[in-house]
């Protein structure tokens, strides 16, 4: 059971790392540039979506 939990934690950490490096796997809606802070610094809101998070 400990091995299963350890593998699960590793998978979660890697998925968070990939999300951080490549943006969110889904389009992030926004109204202002402040809504895009989770996508990284300096990311702008264009056409209602954070540009870096919609690759």
Curated annotation (Swiss-Prot):
- Tissue specificity annotation: Expressed by the venom gland.
Q: Which GO terms describe its cellular component?
A: extracellular region
Q: Give the subcellular location.
A: Secreted
- Could you tell me the keywords of this UniProt record? Disulfide bond, Secreted, Signal
| Source organism superkingdom | Eukaryota
Q: Which organism was this protein described from?
A: Olivierus martensii (Manchurian scorpion)
Q: What else is known?
A: Negative results: does not show any effect on Na(+), Ca(2+) currents, nor on voltage-gated and calcium-activated potassium channels.
- Which residue pairs form cystines in this protein? 30-45, 36-50, 39-53
Leader sequence residues: 1-23
Task: Please state what the protein is called.
Answer: Neurotoxin BmKX-A1-S31
**Matching SUPFAM superfamilies:** Scorpion toxin-like
Q: Does the keyword Secreted apply?
A: yes
Its primary localisation, in coarse terms, equals: secreted
């Amino acid at each position: 059971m400990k091995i299963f939990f350890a593998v699960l934690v590793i998978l979660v950490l890697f998925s968070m790392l990939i999300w951080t490096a490549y943006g969110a796997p889904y389009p992030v809606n926004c109204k202002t540039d402040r809504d895009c802070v989770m996508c990284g610094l300096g990311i702008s809101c264009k056409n209602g979506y954070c540009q870096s998070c919609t690759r």
